[in-house]
Design a protein with these regions (language model features):
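Long, highly charged low-complexity segments enriched in Glu/Asp and Lys/Arg with interspersed Ser/Thr
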Residues: 362-399
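Structured, contiguous alpha/beta core segments that scaffold functional sites
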Residues: 1-59, 69, 74-279, 387-422
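A contiguous, surface-oriented mixed alpha/beta subdomain in the mid-to-C-terminal portion of proteins
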Residues: 193-363, 370-377
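Extended alpha-helical coiled-coil "stalk/arm" regions that scaffold and mediate dimerization/assembly
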Residues: 61-65
């Protein structure tokens, strides 16, 4: 009993506010609305993107499919796509806004009018995670956005609205760069504006949600599962062996014994090594017992399969083979891949492409006001049920009937001329 009194147990609760970060809360602080409980919801989405391999692959696959082989325009106006700003073409802009659209659910462009205000001179991409919306007007319109790449560092807010990181006092937004919402009618007094695409989402008034929002917790599970296995490999001894010594060692001696054991036997580099122990008498021999896994290997295998399927479903990828993931027990998947690709192209990629193409076409109409009757589309290879491919062009949602076919005909004509005159 006396010895038992020397043993104390403590319960340690770990909390990193992960549950709060999943919630895309919109709450007013000072003159703008924070994006997430701690004003870091976009940074949370970036964290998921960078740390979940399957989620990262899904996003990249969608973005690459959306961008396709790039923007195309009718032959007379092709040169308009070459310059969005001094450093980038419209294809460069397309790649960035396609990623933002998929990752955050929206995208933003800085629009700069010419000195004489007759046309848009330059258009730049703005990382959507940098935006925080100003409070809506009485008419329900967002007048503009504050812009910073340090929201999670300097302007992180607590649940109640108070500043979480005490870098600044209340009213920090006053010194932040601000851009009014894109409005050609105000181009004279507002030469720099911001165009923000923020589609309607139930419950969201200021910020969008990505289409995979329902799987945010599942993506976290994927990351934590990888972290669990990584730590298991690094700390090799902890989950597999119980070692009991009978030396009545003091704390310093116990720490030294633990250090020697970890140094000699833990980690992946020591897997399969021989354990040799020399003691002065049998009474002092340590007791080494394996800790049964209780089926944890099978549990985590099933968990991994469940997580993978849920993430794929959230991204509307019906077949894992589209990402190069082989399904166990499947003999052949050619037909499945073709069917899945056709569904993916028409229900996932095409809607993205139509929205982005329409945006580019609208911006070009302000950048080149004298250009009329031009068509813009995204070129891609379309896969058919028999496995054959054909050039396909997706135009904007406001495009007239036949514009896509006209662009396809021009592309085919150009390809034929290049073959005949290499």
């Amino acid at each position: 009993m006396d010895n038992m009194k020397k043993i104390k147990f403590a319960k340690i609760n770990y909390s990193d506010n992960a549950e709060d970060r999943v919630m895309p809360v919109e709450q007013k602080v000072s003159d703008f609305y924070k994006y997430g409980v701690y004003n870091d919801f976009p940074e949370f989405l970036i964290y998921l993107y960078n740390n979940s391999s399957i989620h990262n692959t899904c996003i990249n696959a969608v973005v690459e499919g959306v961008v396709g082989e790039g923007l195309v325009c009718d032959e007379e106006h092709t040169s308009m796509l070459d310059t969005a700003n001094k450093e980038e073409s419209w294809n460069d802009i397309l790649k960035k806004i396609a990623l933002d659209y998929k990752l955050y659910g929206g995208y933003a462009l800085e629009v700069i009018w010419s000195k004489d205000r007759t046309r848009v001179s330059e258009v730049y991409h703005i990382d959507f995670s940098w935006l925080r919306a100003k409070e809506k007007t009485k008419s329900g319109k967002i007048p503009g956005y504050y812009i910073s790449d340090e929201w999670s560092e300097k302007y992180k807010y607590g649940i109640g609205g108070g500043i979480y990181n005490q870098y600044q006092s209340a009213g920090v937004n006053i010194e932040l760069p601000y851009l009014p919402t894109f409005n050609p009618a105000k181009k004279v007094e507002e030469p720099k504006q911001i165009y923000v695409y923020c589609p309607y989402k139930p419950g969201q008034k200021y910020y969008p949600l990505p289409d995979y929002a329902g799987a945010l917790r599942t993506i976290e599970v994927d990351i934590e599962t990888d972290n669990f296995h990584s730590n298991n490999l690094r700390n090799g001894l902890t989950p597999s062996l119980a070692i009991t010594t009978f030396l009545n060692a003091d704390p310093d001696q116990r720490m030294e014994i633990e250090r020697m054991l970890r140094e000699q036997y833990s980690g992946t580099n020591n897997a399969g090594s021989l354990m040799y122990i020399d003691v002065d008498s049998p009474e002092n021999a340590p007791k080494i017992e394996p800790i049964n896994s209780n089926g944890t290997d099978e549990y985590y295998m099933n968990l991994n399969n469940m997580v993978q399927q849920k993430i794929l479903t959230a991204h509307r990828i019906t077949s894992p083979m589209m990402l190069g993931i082989k399904t166990e027990g499947q003999l052949g998947g050619r037909t499945e891949v073709i069917d899945a690709y056709l569904l993916f192209t028409n229900t996932v990629l095409r809607p993205y492409q139509q929205i982005l193409t329409q945006c580019v076409e609208d911006m070009l109409s302000y950048q080149y006001p004298s250009a009329t009757n031009f068509s813009v589309g995204i070129q891609q290879l379309n896969l058919f049920e028999d496995g054959s491919t054909k050039t396909d062009v997706v135009t904007g949602i406001d495009a007239e009937v036949g514009e896509d076919k006209a662009l396809e005909t021009e592309i085919q004509k150009t390809d034929t001329e290049q073959l005949l005159n290499p």
